[in-house]
Amino acid sequence: TTKRGKDGVTKVTYDAYFGQQEVTKRMPVLNATQFAQLENEIYAPNPVYADPSLYGTGVNWQEMIFRKANIQNHQLSLTGGNDKTQVALGANYFNQEGVIKNSDYKRYALRANLDHKISDRFKVGTSLYYTVINENRIQAGGTNVDVSAARGGLLGMAVGAPPTLQPYREDGSIFPFADQYDGRYKEVSNPLGALAVKNYNATNRFLANAYLEVNIFKGLNYRAVFNADLVSSLNEVYSPRSIVDANSLANPLVNSGSAGNYSGYSRSLLHESILTYKTLFQQNHSLNITAVLGSQTDIYQSNNQTASGFGNDINQNWATNGAAVMRTSSSKSKSAFDSYLGRIAYGYKDKYFIDLTSRVDGGSRFGENHKYGFFPAVSAAWRIIEESFMEPLAFFSDLKLRGSYGTTGNAAAIGPYQSLATVSYGGPQNYIFNNTIVSGISPDRIPNADLRWEKSTQYNIGLDMAIFKDRLNIVADYYNKRTNDLLFTKSIPLSSGYTSITGNYGSLENKGVELAVTGRILTGQLKWDASGNITFNKNKVLSLDGTQNEIARSSFSILKVGEPLGVYRTYLSDGINQTGEPILPGYDGKTGGYKVKDINSDGKIDQEDLVIVGNAQPKYFFGFSTSLSYLNFDFSGFLQGVQGSKLFNAFRYTFENPLGQANVLAGLADRWSTTNPSNDFVKGNQGGRLPLTDRYVEDNSYIRLKNITLGYTFPKYKFINSLRAYVTANNLITITKYEGWDPESNSYGSSNDYFYDNGTYPAAKSFVFGIQANF
């Protein structure tokens, strides 16, 4: 969207690629015979299957949900203009099938950029961008901070689906598991039913930008910028009655098909006025003064409708008035920010530089006592290469030392009204009066007039170096960042009448070293460039809310002062309980169950035996890229890696637990028995509440070849200025010890203190062929 037109001949560019993606990894699970044997063990002395050997390998449910998926992208652009007016137009079409069946993503986009010089003093311009996104979604994995949530996503359904059951009835309709084997398998779901659930989302976005530049007099310029970002979305969900088992259909008001229509609209308006003065005086002194005034207003509103109890699946979302039960809700929110910035940049002899910045930001989301925050910054640089003592060191082409110190603010962690007292109505607040349900209202948030900006103060020292006529470039940085007044929602005693409060609690430190090296190794007919980077970061919680040094974030993770984010605390695994000794209140302590270590040697297993077993922060992460060209051929590649991090594999924890009904991972074929005293996997009738141990805190370090590309550029021919064809492979190789779907998984998205894998949408390997043409 930033491509601008240029003065000169009109140019047309067409870029396109076509390819295919697939997930190559499958979770190894028990086949039908092995599963039948396990079921018989669990339900002994009442076996489910008379002869397990008759079932063979059974149904491969993972193959039934995955597919090879096509992908294509087309980009057409036109640029041109004259000395007064420049125009750039573009159109894009992107179509990606999901590697899980019934999922896809389509995008249509148009853009137009216009710049026009009215006179020597006035210039105007605009950028317009319109996009339509249509997608069919699938919930691949569980998203709750709960070790049992893995079963709720499609990947969990496919792994846990009994291979002895049938996917379809004889008439071709989906066969609910609860309707097979006399309802024995009602606790597990046919994954094809989840694929049949409609989850369609349509998003329309219009982004408009306009600017006016005025040259008031030499050196003094004014620029006004106006932005409007308008987004409308529609989400349609429908779960058909055709996938509901017969027993559940006996309660049609609840289970006979369900629908949801969710519409949303957001509007973000931004204005910035920028005044800049640049001057050079006495030849050696440069001065740049900038003042900025900005304001932004965000509005979001939604209308939601849910319905259930449909008589048939004919109309789905389009006739919710035919449902037995229907509910509606709506919401609207508004927030605003304004900013004031002043900056002075001074340079002397293109050798010494200093930059002073003062910024004030205000946000309506914060408490009435702290709407505004002050964020100053200073930076300086010394171009050592310009000093006379560097003249003998001719192999240096650049050498610069720089440093900075400054404060920034964050408001993204809170919503529009989290500093205010709010109320809830409907649902659990409703009550009965005169035999009529009345909508009730109750307070649900404690106000916090002191809710304020989260502030990060960082200092940085860096060195930029280039040698051998810029053939080798090195950039090194040391940084130390401390974040105070963290925006955080903490739990409070229920006796308060509330469950949580949002405030500024705690502080966090990040410090580390970054190193980037770029080299032009060969510069002749064969050209070879390479670059690499590595970052070492240390992360530590400095304080919490002042009343405690530790906060539990889940059943296996904590926030703790002095430790990094994403700390895992569990019991230590001690193999299999070979003697049946008690291990923990709430656990059976049966022979063949998991055993944990008595850390404090007090003769019992309790909370005092929980220990920190790792954290999600990597010791370092790195990347490497290279490119070669010879004659008309070109080659490039990129790999990345992470080392030293841990990830709680909740997916593996779930499917190494032989509860019965659901299938389990293939390792359980070597489970404990009196004739096979394994020390790795529990016996068949030990399913239930397994202890959370370090067994499932895995090393998720990895090295991944992200992409390699081989291309060829054809000679210029008539009206074709250039034509390049290429092939690319993405996510080609991953080296890791991690046993989950993907070592980069985090089921809680971008959260910085929850790290676990409940089975997220797996990374796909892809191969594409593309062309780039210029006319």
Regions found by a protein language model. Give the residues of each.
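Extracellular/periplasmic, surface-exposed regions of secreted and cell-surface proteins
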Residues: 36, 43, 69-72, 107-109, ...
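Glycine-rich, aromatic-lined ligand/substrate-binding cores of catalytic
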Residues: 615-648
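Low-complexity intrinsically disordered tracts that form flexible linkers/tails across taxa
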Residues: 135-158, 526, 544-550, 737-738
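Residues embedded in well-ordered regular secondary structure
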Residues: 4-101, 139-144, 164-199, 212-215, ...
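Conserved small-residue
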Residues: 11-56, 304, 417, 503, ...
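Extracytoplasmic gating/loop element in the C-terminal half of outer-membrane beta-barrel translocons
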Residues: 50-52, 62, 244-247, 323, ...
